[in-house]
Each structure stands twice: as structure tokens, then as C-alpha cells.
């Protein structure tokens, strides 16, 4: 970059940028060390959600198939409710995945055995691992599906109340 353009407040604040200046800026940014900080609690919860939500989705899908194959008199109702529940969980998973992309959080499964699953994550240059036990996963998935169900029932009751008032 020419001496005339360096440290020139007018040029630096300009929104137009020539390709060679952009290359210089990108080169300078790549030379700066990236901040290595451990993830906050919210970031760890995001990673945990990214692990648990797909498990919940597969469980709900299996239950939908079991309901549809049953001879239950209200199987169509149960199936439809489970499908709404599934859509809600899938929507949340999509949000979690987008947030992880935006936050540059990378999560990969490293290994597993009969009791635990190990994950490696990268967060803004900081790398570490964590472990989730299968017992914790079972319990947490059960609790979360219960919360999603409660939220769905609450929304249904609220809608019924609105309908009665009209």
C-alpha cells in the first residue's frame, strides 16, 4: 500500500476498497493471533443441545412409527401430536446449528463405549474435550421431551381458551 494511503483517516473510513487493499487488510488480519478463550456456559449448553436434540429427534421418529403401526383407536391423533413435537425439536436443532456456525464452534464425536461418549470441540481457537455418559443422556432426553410436550400442551390449552372467548 502506498505511503499516501497509510494512516489516512479519510481513506481508512471509506467504504470502497480496491482489491489490492482488501488483500493487504486480509493479510494483516490473518497475521494477528486469534483470541483463545474457553467457551462460556451458554456455549457449552449449545454444544450439549447439538448432541441431545438429534437423539430426541430419532426417539420421536421411532415413536411415531410405533404409533402408526399400532391398533390404537386414537393413533392418528397421537401421531399428529408427535409430528408437531418433532417439528418443534427440528426447528430448535436448526437454530442451534446456525448459532454454532455463527459462533465458529466445531463439535465432533471422538469415541464411545458402552457407558460414555467423548466429544472434541473447537471454540475460537480453543480446543478441548468433554464426555457425556449414556445415563445422563437418557435422563436429559427424557426430561427435555417432557418439557417439549408440556410446552405443546400449554400452547394447545391457550389456543382452546382463545377459541372459547371468541
Show which residues each predicted segment covers.
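Hydrophobic alpha-helical segments and helix-packing faces
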Residues: 39, 46-49, 78, 82, ...
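Conserved non-transmembrane functional hotspots
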Residues: 67, 73, 78, 82-84, ...
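Low-complexity intrinsically disordered segments
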Residues: 88-166
Amino acid at each position: 500500500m502506498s505511503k499516501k494511503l497509510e494512516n489516512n483517516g479519510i481513506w481508512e473510513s471509506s467504504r470502497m476498497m480496491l482489491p489490492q487493499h482488501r488483500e493487504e487488510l486480509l493479510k494483516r488480519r490473518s497475521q494477528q493471533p486469534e483470541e483463545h478463550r474457553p467457551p462460556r456456559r451458554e456455549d457449552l449448553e449449545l454444544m450439549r443441545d447439538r448432541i441431545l436434540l438429534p437423539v430426541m429427534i430419532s426417539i420421536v421418529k421411532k415413536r411415531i412409527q410405533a404409533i402408526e403401526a399400532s391398533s390404537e383407536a386414537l393413533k392418528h391423533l397421537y401421531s399428529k401430536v408427535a409430528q408437531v413435537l418433532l417439528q418443534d425439536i427440528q426447528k430448535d436443532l436448526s437454530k442451534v446449528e446456525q448459532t454454532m456456525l455463527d459462533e465458529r464452534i466445531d463439535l465432533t464425536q471422538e469415541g464411545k463405549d458402552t457407558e460414555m461418549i467423548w466429544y472434541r470441540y473447537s471454540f475460537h481457537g480453543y480446543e478441548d474435550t468433554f464426555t457425556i455418559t449414556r445415563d445422563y443422556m437418557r435422563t436429559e432426553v427424557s426430561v427435555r421431551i417432557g418439557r417439549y410436550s408440556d410446552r405443546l400442551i400449554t400452547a394447545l390449552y391457550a389456543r382452546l381458551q382463545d377459541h372459547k372467548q371468541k
